[in-house]
Amino acid sequence: RLFNNEYEYVDFDRNSYGGRVRFGKAISDWSSLNFRYRYENITIDQLKLAASEVFSQGTDEISSIGLGVTYDTRDNFINPSRGISTTFNIEESNDIFGANLFYTKYTADFAKYYSIKRNHTLSYKIEGAFIDFREIGDKIVVGERFYLGGPNNLRGFKASRISPRRLLSTGNFVRIGGNKYVFNTLEYLFPIALETGLRGILFVDAGNTYDESKNIDYNPIDMRKDVGFGFRWLSPMGPLKLDFGFPLGERKSGESKYEVQFSIGSLF
């Protein structure tokens, strides 16, 4: 699969192009192995607020191979009501494959779905990742670092706003991203108008990103949290998701009382 992406973060722009190849092999009724190759050319530019003090600006090349294992007993991939899904992946990018950005990345997730009664589903999901960068010099290479916030994780916050911060000489802060993160969510999906495919959802999210100076901390005080509600519609284009998230606890500068998130994807 080929791609060409442009993404504007708060403190920089990330532009990339490349491709991915993936193939898998079933090892049982519920388990599979997958192998991946990824090439991506990443350009970081438009640094803001003197962020060049800490960020490495320019172009990096990722050339990586990956191995993953999946165990999945869900009764439906788009709208599961029971079962579990868990994955573990490792990705290696180094000069052997032609990269100039060297790292090893580990990612894992686990989800459990409970059928409370007909068309009522409770789910819990936890995911996390760790990336070990090598030979990157004094400045931070942000292209592969982790940010939370947005429609796919902490829905009470703007996209990519949850991140460790670094103080600049100007007195401003920049979000440097984490080399690790953890995210949890508890969701309850219920019918509103089944004949049209419309459902409602209640959710609680908790998670955070951490830089090299900190370990992942499961202390609730250290995690950013939100609650909210939303709607799911199985449209002809696929599942549509509209969520209203409300952050809990003390808000930092630039954070709103609530966020509205829209996306297309699975119901959960």
Where are these regions (language model features)?
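Outer-membrane beta-barrel and related beta-rich outer-membrane complex signature
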Residues: 42-49, 134-146, 212-216, 254
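Extracytoplasmic gating/loop element in the C-terminal half of outer-membrane beta-barrel translocons
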Residues: 119-203, 211
